[in-house]
Amino acid sequence: MESTTAFSAVTSALGIQDVHIMAPYLWMLVLGFVIAFVLAFSVGANDVANSFGTAVGSGVVTLRQACILASIFETVGSVLLGAKVSETIRKGLIDVTMYNSTQELLMAGSISAMFGSAVWQLAASFLKLPISGTHCIVGATIGFSLVAKGQQGVKWIELLRIVLSWFISPLLSGIMSALLFFFVKKFILCKADPVPNGLRALPVFYACTIGINLFSIMYTGAPLLGFDKVPLWGIILISVGCAVFCALFVWFFVCPRMKRKIECEFKSSPSESPLMNKKNRELHCPILKPDPDNIKLPVDGGIVAEVKVPILDMVTVSRTEERTVTFNMGDCDDPIEKEKLNSMETNIDQPMNGSVQLANGNHVQFSQTVSNEMNSSGQYQYHTVHKDSGLYKDLLHKLHLAKVGDCMGDSGDKPLRRNNSYTSYTMAICGMPLDSFRNWDAEARPDEAEKLTVHGADGKKRIRMDSYTSYCNAVADAHMDVEAEEQEEGCIEDVVTDRKSSSSSLEERHDQDKPEVSLLFQFLQILTACFGSFAHGGNDVSNAIGPLVALYLVYESGDVATKAATPIWLLLYGGIGICIGLWVWGRRVIQTMGKDLTPITPSSGFSIELASALTVVIASNVGLPISTTHCKVGSVVSVGWLRSKKAVDWRLFRNIFLAWFVTVPISGLISAGIMALFKYAILKV
């Protein structure tokens, strides 16, 4: 009696009326809801990075802000747009009429498909690899159908479309993103003053963003919003009208406000503001302490590099004057500076055979080959590193304020990370051997730490460095010495090679958006990310809920080809699961999309978002197979390659492509295994 009451309560809560036919399979419905939630969790952990990965990578929003925005728009999108797409997932892959007399097999197949898709997406999220949720569920659906009914009823054309999308999606989206970013770079980023052109282009960018995304959302034909009753010409008219209105609003209201904001920030703090113009950046500060700390270090070819860390008199220096750090490397073209440098002493201690004494009494000992060339070289080049650069701040903080020698404490144990922006430069000017570093970097994983072995008087000493302590450790180590002459000769050769890589890292640093450009593109990127998240919620909730909808409707009606609409509460259930997955595990794939694959700036992030959205709209309308994930990855790689050819992690891109390749077979195999268990061990049909 109690079990009957509990059963009635469950069926009543689910809104099920006629349950006499499928009542023995209630356990399958409950199991399906549990697995569907896990699948929604995996979709949130992996696929949501498509929307906000680039926004987080460019620094426009924090990870927490991205999760909040994505939770809102994914949930709303799943409820308002998800019903339409669920029909395709439920009926577009297999012929469900084959299961008219064996409804329990279709229910078992839905559970198997969700399980196979969830397992592979969770594994991909653990590996930080963005994959297509749609391809996962398609492969899993084909897998269970092959076990249940063989090749009969499988629509193989869908599988062919998926294979084509591996190449069409990233290539087409990459080309469009590259074209858009080339336009932005040529007419805005490369200008001496990018603000005027940026303000002129702002209405066009907003209009395109609103028009493209609005058309994409309306074209889905979501029945809950009545879009299924709007003809195509009506959708185009509404989208264009909203785009024009948005452009006029931005031109007359947003652009003047943005211009005033930029000018206000520039005038309020001309020396400290990030919007400082180029002339002010070139000013030198003549008011320095009379006795600055001089550090002379060897670079390639035996040429001496002198690092000056001058101290400002904060009372007498005006706001327009800056602190500088100078390096002497080769010939100097400025006659005034040349005369000044010729009057300076090298401060190289000859008896110590190429050692340099720092202000705090520490010595830096160099190899014999380097020290001989140091002593014979008398040519210098004056190079300025200004106070707003990361290298200056690092030097000022570590070499002067921390008094050099004190930096060798706990901070010296931090690991050296791959793609370190300061390490190459540090090693180059300090003459440190780099063979072990490069060999390790070619084999080890990116997140592993490097240990550099340096031979000294006290035996082998391992020095670990990160981007904040590498310079300090290299300069302040008093016991650096090289035993073998082959290693000494290799040191100079390594430095020459490594300075090329250091110049490329400096080049990437200069390729960052100017602050005023970032200000122009920040809200645009947030807007495109929110639109993308809204559309993504409507599209990808079907990947998690589509099989559950089939399971629920079959159980409710006993008919595999029921025409009932998708319940809204089921879509909301999937949206909640997606949001939880995003909050718990979404940061992993977001890091891959926004940081690891290539550096992202607001301008490049906007180009990626808008062009990939446009690609999806065009390809969907002309019938080309397309994947949102593949489009986004293709855009990220192409724009990153256009910004800097060495900025893309091609090894990571190769791994992502391999993950795409195995997505369908792996999810299909897992689903087929679970379906075989259901068919031959549990249901025995």
Curated annotation (Swiss-Prot):
GO terms for molecular function: phosphate transmembrane transporter activity; symporter activity. The chain crosses the membrane at residues 21-41, 66-86, 106-126, 162-182, 207-227, 234-254, 517-537, 565-585, 606-626, 656-676. Residues 496-511 have a biased composition (Basic and acidic residues). It comes from the Eukaryota. GO terms for cellular component: membrane. Its main location: membrane. The keyword Lipid biosynthesis does not apply. Residues 489-511 are annotated as: Disordered. GO terms for biological process: phosphate ion transmembrane transport. It is found in: Membrane. Keywords: Membrane, Phosphate transport, Symport, Transmembrane, Transmembrane helix, Transport. Belongs to the inorganic phosphate transporter (PiT) (TC 2.A.20) family. This is Sodium-dependent phosphate transporter 1-B. It comes from Xenopus laevis.
